[in-house]
């Protein structure tokens, strides 16, 4: 090597060379009779210096390693002792250990109630005197309709005869058509003749209040339903595997189409409306008659979820008009809407995000005009509980009304039907859970925070001082080492919008030590997920933290209750998952708490959280160093239609591909453990297996856990143990205790 900066000739005729070197942080000088000799001597000097330094560094490294080993021995993480403590936490910090913590309220009448406590003894189960169930059951009732799985679409073919308002007649479905007859079966008449297997009439028949009309939807079912097939590898009933099938519509699949039809009972006149206002259905709900016996109202959710209408069909003219229309460039969150008719069906209370915040509106049915916005402001109505027309009050829950409080806290409120007199019935700065009596004049309210023990009070709607009924006493669990999680806020990606979350620490926390960080993620969308109530034990987090981790959970952009724009970040972009906000939040926490080692950050989640945790190491592997993902909907084209088209839109386009963990699997450069239940009836297990296939083809190293007989799961105790070991190995850099050794200590 020839590195030098200066060559000069000395007075005695020799030459000297000088070079700057980073080895010693200074200069080396060498001399020689010739330039070549000086350079050679300098190179030899450099080599000797490097060898000497390497010997010294090796000696220093050995001393540091010995010191580190001693330190780890004194305060190791992920040890058998940590596992033992973690296993004890569910019982040690059980809710039953907190006296005065109300678990439920049962109103006997308007003034009498019973409180139930978590500390109450568990009720003894009554012994069953029934004979053991046999494989075959015979009844006198004949064939019965099988219980419908929650994933199955209701075909509306089943239904008992519907009596008329005066009980003299019945309407029913026969041979796919609408029939009426006297109650005794006489004078049977067909009101429709065009019903077929491929276009039949719904059994949900509606009589007009005056008995003049009946209404039923003509249904055009999908031409071919999609099914997911499962192989139950290890059934309890037999040795050989069992094949199961489950109806399972996916994004882009055909949808059932409905046309509300009206039949005049006396004349048989049919009113078949033009479907221009409801032609491209994701779904159609109703119909239902208004009190005037002339107007049939139904709700139309357009495919793609950008248009939602409340429509009215006139029984005389057959014309359809729009009473309410909601539109959005992204999505209308149809699962959040609320509608209730008041004032003899002449007005409707309607809930909408049309001004970016979820609020209540008063709508005139005849004109479709908005009469008044009943609530307004940069906060959200969460749920309408009760409408009392006599008192002119709407009872509802809300979040974000108080700017100096956690915006996710739930409060119970009332507002007048005229939009005046907004009141917060539960003013304490905490998360509230209340139960009203039947007349909505009193409520029992339990309020708490993640770091504040619960208090239960009795309130009156009219006001007055609340009566304290119970206070949670946490002294027992505190004496055993319980510590509340820390409520922590920090700006997200934009540098200004606060993100709210929790920081969990182990019971033996020592701020002088360094801790790996693990995030528990479920970013939805459709809700908020960070616990706001007091918890003595968090099932997925507390025991994991006890191994020697800092575990965090937060709600970031893409989740609910912070305004529509906050949630719309997810639109056609589920891969975002609020991860830029989460990374900023964790970095801010680590800046305040240097013991949080953000060079060792892991992440885990289930379902959507499974998709998001895998996505985190694929697209943000520079920050997230390991991921555990259970039952993930890794490719939104593979998951259920209703959840994915709501957030990813329709038709299925390139955004689905861009958000797919299958498409991005080749990016994996971090440890990843995938877990799936072979009978998952929520997320198609093939979603996980297709990621596995892509990882194998890309030559990536990963771990896979398949649980026989399990459904949508984080893996239970087995999955938890695998998750513990995974993070101990990859974030702590130590081998976890052998399972057999842990069993010996149990």
Give short role names for the model-derived ranges.
Residues 105-110, 161-169, 204-213, 286-296, ...:
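Blade-terminus and WD-like Trp-Asp/Gly-His loop motifs, strongest in beta-propeller folds
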Residues 127-150, 194, 198-202, 216-273, ...:
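Predominantly five- to eight-bladed beta-propeller fold
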Residues 293, 299, 431-746:
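Serine-hydrolase catalytic core recognition
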Residues 119-123, 154-157, 168-179, 193-201, ...:
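A flexible loop/linker signature enriched in serine peptidases of the S9 family
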Residues 89-94, 141-150, 189-198, 251, ...:
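Surface-exposed loop and turn segments in beta-propeller and other repeat-based domains
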Residues 90-121, 155-162:
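Beta-strand-rich domains and repeat architectures in extracellular enzymes and scaffolds
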Residues 183-186, 265-268, 315-318, 365-367, ...:
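Short loop/turn segments that connect beta-strands within beta-propeller blades
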Residues 24-37:
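A short, exposed loop/beta-hairpin motif centered on an aromatic-Gly-Thr core
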């Amino acid at each position: 090597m020839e590195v030098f900066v200066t060559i000069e000739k000395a007075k005695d005729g020799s030459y000297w060379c000088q070079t700057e070197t980073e080895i010693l942080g200074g200069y080396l000088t060498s001399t020689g009779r010739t330039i070549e000799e000086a350079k050679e001597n300098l190179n030899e000097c450099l080599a000797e210096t490097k060898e000497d330094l390497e010997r010294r560094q090796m000696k220093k490294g050995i001393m540091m390693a010995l010191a580190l080993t001693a330190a780890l021995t004194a305060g190791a993480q992920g040890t058998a002792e940590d596992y033992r403590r973690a296993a004890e936490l569910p019982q040690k910090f059980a809710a039953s250990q907190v006296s005065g913590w109300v678990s439920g309220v049962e109103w006997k009448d308007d003034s009498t109630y019973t409180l139930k406590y978590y500390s109450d003894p568990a009720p003894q189960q009554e012994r069953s005197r029934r004979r053991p169930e046999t494989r075959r059951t015979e009844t006198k009732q004949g064939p019965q309709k099988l219980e419908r799985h929650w994933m199955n679409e209701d075909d509306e073919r089943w239904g008992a005869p519907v009596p008329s308002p005066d009980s003299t007649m019945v309407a029913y479905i026969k041979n796919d058509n609408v029939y009426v007859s006297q109650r005794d079966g006489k004078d049977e008449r067909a009101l429709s003749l065009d019903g077929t297997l491929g276009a039949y009439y719904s059994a949900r028949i509606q009589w007009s209040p005056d008995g003049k009309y009946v209404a039923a939807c003509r249904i055009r079912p999908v031409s071919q339903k999609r099914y997911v097939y499962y192989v139950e590898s290890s059934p309890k009933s037999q040795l050989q595997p069992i094949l199961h099938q489950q109806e399972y519509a996916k994004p882009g699949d055909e949808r059932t189409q409905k046309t509300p039809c009206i039949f005049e009972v006396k004349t048989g006149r049919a009113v078949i409306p033009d479907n221009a206002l409801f032609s491209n259905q994701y779904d159609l709900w109703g119909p239902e008659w208004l009190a005037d016996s002339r107007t049939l109202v139904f709700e139309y959710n357009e495919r793609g979820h950008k248009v939602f209408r409340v429509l009215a069909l006139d029984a005389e003219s057959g014309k359809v008009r729009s009473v309410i229309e909601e539109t959005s460039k992204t999505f209308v969150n149809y699962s959040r809407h609320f509608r209730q008719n008041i004032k003899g069906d002449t007005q409707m209370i309607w809930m909408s995000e049309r001004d970016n915040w979820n609020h209540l509106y008063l709508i005139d049915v005849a004109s479709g005009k908005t009469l008044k916005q009943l609530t307004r402001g940069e906060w959200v109505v969460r749920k309408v509980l009760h409408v009392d027309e006599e008192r002119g009050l709407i009872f509802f829950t809300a979040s974000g009304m108080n700017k100096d409080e956690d915006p996710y806290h739930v409060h119970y409120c009332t507002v007048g039907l005229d939009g005046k007199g907004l009141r917060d019935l539960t003013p304490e700065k905490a998360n509230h859970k209340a139960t009203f009596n039947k007349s909505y004049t009193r409520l029992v309210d339990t309020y708490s925070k993640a770091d504040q023990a619960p208090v239960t009070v009795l309130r009156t709607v009219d006001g007055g001082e609340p009566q304290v009924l119970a206070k949670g006493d946490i002294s027992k669990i505190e004496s055993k080492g319980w510590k509340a999680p820390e409520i922590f806020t920090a700006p997200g990606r934009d540098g200004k919008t606060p993100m709210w979350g929790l920081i969990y620490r182990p019971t033996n926390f020592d701020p002088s030590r360094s801790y790996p960080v693990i995030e528990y993620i479920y970013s939805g969308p459709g809700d908020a997920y960070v616990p706001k109530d007091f918890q003595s034990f968090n099932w997925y987090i507390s025991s994991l933290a006890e191994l020697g981790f800092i575990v965090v959970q937060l709600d970031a952009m893409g989740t609910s209750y912070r305004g529509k724009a906050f949630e719309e970040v997810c639109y056609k972009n589920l891969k975002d998952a609020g991860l830029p906000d989460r990374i900023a939040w964790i970095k801010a926490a680590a800046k305040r708490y240097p013991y949080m080692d953000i060079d060792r950050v892991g992440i885990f989640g289930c379902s959507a959280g499974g998709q998001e945790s895998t996505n985190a190491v694929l697209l943000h592997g520079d920050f997230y160093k390991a991921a555990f993902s259970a039952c993930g909907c890794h490719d939104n084209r593979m998951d259920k239609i209703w959840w994915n088209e709501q957030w990813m839109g329709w038709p299925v386009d390139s955004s689905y591909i861009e958000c797919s963990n299958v498409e991005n699997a080749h990016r994996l450069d971090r440890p990843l453990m995938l877990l799936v239940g072979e009978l998952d009836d929520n997320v198609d297990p093939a979603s996980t297996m297709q990621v596995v296939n892509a990882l194998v083809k890309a030559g990536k190293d990963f771990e896979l856990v398949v649980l026989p007989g399990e459904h949508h799961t984080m893996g239970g105790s087995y999955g938890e143990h695998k998750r513990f070991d995974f993070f101990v190995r990859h974030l702590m850099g130590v081998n976890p205790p052998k399972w057999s050794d842990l069993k010996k200590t149990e």
